[in-house]
Amino acid sequence: MPHRIHSHQSPPQEINMTFKSAITVSLVEEARGGPFVYWEGLKDACEKSAALGFDAIEIFAPGPDAVDESELKGLLQEHGLVVAAVGTGAGMVKHGWSLTHADADHRAKARDFVKQMIDFGGKYNAPAIIGSMQGKWGGDISRDQALAFLREALDELGPYAAQYNVPLFYEPLNRYETNLLRTVDEGVEFCKTLSTDNIKLLADLFHMNIEEADLAAAIRAGKGYVGHIHFVDSNRQAAGMGHMNHEPIIQALKDIDYDGYLCAEAFALPDSDTAAKNTIEAYKRLTA
């Protein structure tokens, strides 16, 4: 009778993908009323988000020097939080800078500002986000020229972010905010034309609800490119407060092995505390 060899190897284990929760805090007074949950400073945001069980904060700061490094690191340590990402939109909101502006000096200033924000985020291992600073085409600038300027910028800024071992997030926006790239698929195809592989897409569910025919299918098609999620509802309020069906979206994220943040870039409606509470309740229900 042949000798039977017994294997001591354990059966393969199913990988348990774990999402992480994050919430936005704006320090930019000029953006007051915009889609950010917390507005009363980092101390307030850290205390309240940690108490609710969030894993991280996403910071929208007016500039790289607006935050005291030792203070923020102390708050993060005290409350068991990290920084999920940092926005660069203050470059547009405060200065009107765009990466696709017709003037070369203007574009250089825009890139320098983004680099400074990459440096700021790098202190906390947090990627920076290119959203509104991508600009638009029109006037003397054709769409092809604007996309060439954007490609030039991302090919410079992506490798710059790599020194901190983080990607740079590029966010397709809806038609009312940009006329460049508006869908995940357009973002993926654009990324394929870059010389850097350090650009990941930020998929914002609010923008996607306007531009995508099928949000879950768009996310699946973005496998390997989607690096960050803005987790909101159809009306840009907290998840659960609009008419979006989040279950297929969460399943799609699981299908592409997404293990990043679901971050609430939502209006503080009816107020910050309620928006935060609604968000974490929806997050826990959907990711249980």
Predicted regions and their residues:
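N-terminal pre-domain/capping segments
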Residues: 8-122, 155, 196, 280-288
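Hydrophobic faces of well-ordered beta-strands that scaffold small-molecule active sites
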Residues: 19-25, 57-59, 83-88, 128-130, ...
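Active-site-proximal loop/turn and secondary-structure-junction residues that shape catalytic pockets
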Residues: 27-29, 61-63, 89-90, 134-136, ...
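Gly/Pro-rich active-site loop or hairpin
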Residues: 29-39, 100-105, 141, 180-181, ...
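Active-site acidic/histidine proton-transfer and metal-coordination neighborhood
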Residues: 39-40, 77-78, 97-200
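Structural motif
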Residues: 52, 123-124, 224, 256
